[in-house]
Amino acid sequence: DLQTIYEQIFNGHVERFDKKAKECAPFIVSASIGLIDKVAAKFLPTSVRFTYFWTMREMTNLFQNMCLAKDKYYGTGDSLAKLWCHECRRVLADRLITIDETKIIDDMIGECHADHLKKQGVSADVHLNDEEHANIFTTFTAVEPDGAYRPIDDLAQLSKVLEAKLVEYNESNAMMDLVLFDD
């Protein structure tokens, strides 16, 4: 079953992690399965919403990026839960069409977090609908050169890094004129 498959994958990845982080792995898997089941039941494909076709690919994408976490930075179940919230939003909500649908996904993530992780004492402490305290992870703004998948603490700093990367790209490639926005 899916629980066994993804639990084996994720347990293998978090094997070197702190004991508390390892203990939350099965609950992250069950929360993921529960969330994707809820999303698939709520957001059915239509002719307008043809991207609302949910498969195991979403689970695979979610755990592919969860497995970018390094034990050096994710020593607690709480930090893994925060990454899980980010990945769920990225993998699932990025395919949605309206902001209202994104808010529904955020609520579903919160419910699955409460049902599967909070009961185990694991708290992500994220504000999913709060743009001021965005829960964003990336590999390219870390100070360390190891390319670690880390949370963004400062959105202004993220904006500066993205603008610098765009300038760097434009110096060696065809000009790309992008507008960065918060959504």
Enumerate the predicted regions with their spans.
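Alpha-helical lid/collar subdomain of P-loop NTPases
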Residues: 1-183
